[in-house]
Amino acid sequence: MAEAEYFIWIAPEGDFEEEFGNITRMLPTGEYFSPCKRVPMTNRQAVVVFYALVFLLSLLGNSLVMLVILYRRRTRSVTDVYVLNLAIADLLFSLTLPFLAVSKWKGWIFGTPLCKMVSLLKEVNFFSGILLLACISVDRYLAIVHATRTLTRKRYLVKFVCMGTWGLSLVLSLPFAIFRQAYKPYRSGTVCYEVLGEATADLRITLRGLSHIFGFLLPLFIMLVCYGLTLRTLFKAHMRQKRRAMWVIFAVVLVFLLCCLPYNLVLLSDTLLGAHLIQDTCERRNNIDQALYITEILGFSHSCLNPVIYAFVGQSFRHEFLKILANLVHKEVLTHHSASFRTSLTTIY
């Protein structure tokens, strides 16, 4: 194999996390590199604050979504099971944000085991998110276009579908965790990064390609086809009630695409660059790195947006949440009156 071409310049101050946080190609480890000066990423303080805000909103919002769905056990639908799994995925991802925020500020100080764990949770969240949305699109298509309660509508089978989705997400995410480790490049701070040699570079490109196909392009195609056919049926049959019920799902899918599609398109360009299918130049590399930096932040924000959609678009969610809140207040009032009554009896007798 021909030697890999490197257009990399290490900043003298050694701020690797800021300069190279989103590079996905193989890193050189020697002292001399091709002189390609990188444009530094700025506003790290703002990024850290943003991560902290997303973490808090995601933790609170997704916990409430899980509470509402678990509370309505008797009336829980198939779609609710998928939404519950979406909330779990976003909640797990939010747990990685404190580590990512610290790494933006101080570099990776948590060692290789946590580097692998955080990378795994981050990737599993993304893959499981889009795969679960694809499952929801198929479920809605079968329920509305074919107007049937097939075997896929049975709750026990849906649980197996969700388990399969998590399993596939784990398989697609494993390469990212396997290759990542706490790495200290020449004249730079430690970073959680994929350390690859020349022998594994082609394997990594292949794995990235498979991830793009099975973890993004194929589920996206399934969603577009299923929702296209579902929308056509809804408008032809004038199903107003079902059309209103679909707005929440459409909003969830739309927000997911707006947040995650830009990052994946840039990541696909980065993969093509690493595979030498498009010419690697300093200007192109810098443009892709900056685009990855920005679109990744946009993608992270998705983990806290679904609960907002359920709250403002989903009438059923608001009703159930207010019902839970009313029950809690009612129990608190009863407990207070009961305690007051016991105190009065004790005082009298």
Swiss-Prot record:
Q: Which residues lie on this side of the membrane: Cytoplasmic?
A: 72-80, 139-159, 226-247, 314-349
Q: Which residues are glycosylated?
A: 22
Q: Which InterPro entries match?
A: CCR1-9-like, Chemokine_CXCR_1/2, GPCR_Rhodpsn, GPCR_Rhodpsn_7TM
* Spans traversing the lipid bilayer: 45-71, 81-101, 117-138, 160-179, 205-225, 248-269, 291-313
Subunit: Interacts with IL8. Interacts with GNAI2.
Role summary: Receptor to interleukin-8, which is a powerful neutrophils chemotactic factor. Binding of IL-8 to the receptor causes activation of neutrophils. This response is mediated via a G-protein that activates a phosphatidylinositol-calcium second messenger system.
Q: What is this protein called?
A: C-X-C chemokine receptor type 1
Q: Gene name, please?
A: Cxcr1
